[in-house]
Regions:
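Non-heme di-metal
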Residues: 1-197
Length: 197
């Protein structure tokens, strides 16, 4: 997980909480995938002049919806129910930081949105890794290992475009600041059966 450079790793005991309510983690996970697809489409809508970004984020949005479907299939197969969409306090805190960090220019808006997206993908990827290595459920362990690889690719996509289109912005410095901020935020989580909880 070194490439993601997260400051605060997830305590593996979080998986013990998850295992007590598989329906809750799967429901939360399904909605995380839906929100990730919606986020990618929002970036496309606001930055349609960047043909390469549009092409790659269309593919990413489709993949996120495919993941939503995969999670929903697991829910159905297990006789569980997809609950209502959950509020994600972790993501909301990152979104507030993104808004505060935007200096008002289009370039800054795009870079901050891309770094926000990369941060969520990086943490999700790390959580999937922890799940795959610690959950006592062979099907879910395999599923989360496969998703982990996909999410790492998404993280890379967002960071790559932040670097490419962040003209006049020290993207590496901003990314380090994002990582430091995220560590403070995630320190308050890890005790709920949700992907970022």
């Amino acid at each position: 997980m070194g490439v993601l450079r997260l400051e605060l790793p997830t305590d593996p005991r979080w998986v013990n909480i998850v295992e007590k309510n598989i329906e809750e983690i799967l429901t939360d996970h399904a909605w995380c995938e839906q929100k990730a697809a919606t986020n990618a489409i929002t970036i496309i809508t606001n930055n349609s002049e960047h043909e390469d970004l549009v092409t790659d984020l269309l593919a990413l949005a489709k993949e996120e919806l495919d993941h939503f479907e995969q999670v929903h299939d697991i829910i159905k197969k297990r006789g569980l129910k997809l609950g209502r969409e959950r509020k994600d306090d972790y993501v909301n805190e990152l979104a507030q930081y993104m808004k505060r960090s935007n200096n008002g220019s289009r370039v800054s808006g795009l870079v901050e949105r891309l770094l926000f997206s990369a941060m969520i993908e990086a943490r999700s990827c790390e959580r999937f890794k922890v799940l795959s290595e610690n959950i006592n459920d062979e099907e879910l362990s395999k599923f989360y290992r496969e998703l982990m690889e996909s999410e790492a690719g998404h993280y890379t996509t967002f960071i790559t475009y932040a670097r490419k289109y962040g003209t006049g912005i020290d993207v590496e410095k901003r990314w380090r600041e994002w990582i430091a901020f995220e560590a403070k935020v995630i320190a308050n989580y890890g005790n709920k059966e949700t992907i970022h909880g």
